[in-house]
């Protein structure tokens, strides 16, 4: 591994560790702030924004985009959109496993003893945010495939994360850790699937 790659990975891990630590530290403060600044109109809006992060919506969008790209004969974008779907599925599976393993109660749920069977209740699926992990993984691959288009879509997972905290579904740490999980899934999928596109394009240019 090149020194530059080691440096980037080390920097990324350091930033992630600091972000996770800070998120857990400010969990209670952010939860209390949100609870004191909720209003009915904004709560209704945030519920609708939160639905944008639902897994089926991302999956259908990915399928439609893949179908269009395949129909147009664009191999690059067919691979990109398929990679987005794979990253979406990976983030969903890993996130679900972590939710069941940690069984963290949502901010809106009163603290009580967590029995084994309650691990499978959505009330105890706070950590990490599945909506955020899926959205970040999905659009993260798009960013790695085309940073200009991906950059324009970055506000979507950000708004989803804010909405999940506002409606009391997640803590700040749930959202931050989910974003990191989504980034890792996007990088992993892109490394194996999108790298072939970059190598092919570089050979054509050379």
Locate predicted features.
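Membrane-embedded catalytic cores of phosphoryl/pyrophosphoryl-handling enzymes
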Residues: 2-10, 113-206
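Aromatic-anchored segments of alpha-helical transmembrane domains
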Residues: 17-23, 89-96, 157-169
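Alpha-helical transmembrane segments in multi-pass membrane proteins
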Residues: 19, 83-87, 91, 95, ...
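Alpha-helical membrane-inserting segments
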Residues: 27, 42, 65, 90, ...
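Transmembrane helix-loop junctions in multipass membrane proteins, especially transporters and channels
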Residues: 28, 32, 70-74, 100-108, ...
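Membrane-interface loops
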Residues: 32, 74-144, 149
């Amino acid at each position: 591994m090149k020194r530059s790659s080691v440096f980037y990975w080390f920097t990324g891990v350091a930033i992630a560790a600091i972000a996770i630590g800070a998120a857990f530290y400010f969990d209670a403060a952010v939860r209390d702030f949100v609870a004191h600044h909720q209003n009915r109109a904004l709560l209704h809006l945030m519920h609708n924004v939160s639905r944008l992060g639902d897994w089926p919506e991302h999956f259908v969008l990915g399928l439609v985009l893949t179908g269009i790209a395949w129909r147009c004969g664009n191999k690059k974008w067919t691979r990109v959109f398929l990679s987005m779907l794979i990253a979406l599925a990976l983030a969903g599976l890993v996130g679900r496993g972590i939710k069941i393993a940690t069984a963290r109660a949502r901010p809106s749920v009163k603290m009580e003893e967590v029995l084994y069977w309650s691990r499978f209740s959505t009330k105890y699926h706070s950590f990490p945010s599945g909506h955020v992990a899926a959205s970040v993984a999905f659009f993260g691959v798009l960013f790695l495939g085309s940073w200009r288009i991906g950059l324009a879509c970055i506000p979507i997972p950000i708004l989803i994360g804010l909405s999940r905290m506002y409606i009391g579904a997640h803590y700040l740490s749930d959202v931050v850790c989910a974003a990191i999980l989504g980034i890792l899934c996007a990088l992993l999928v892109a490394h194996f699937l999108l790298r072939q596109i970059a190598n092919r394009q570089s050979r054509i240019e050379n």
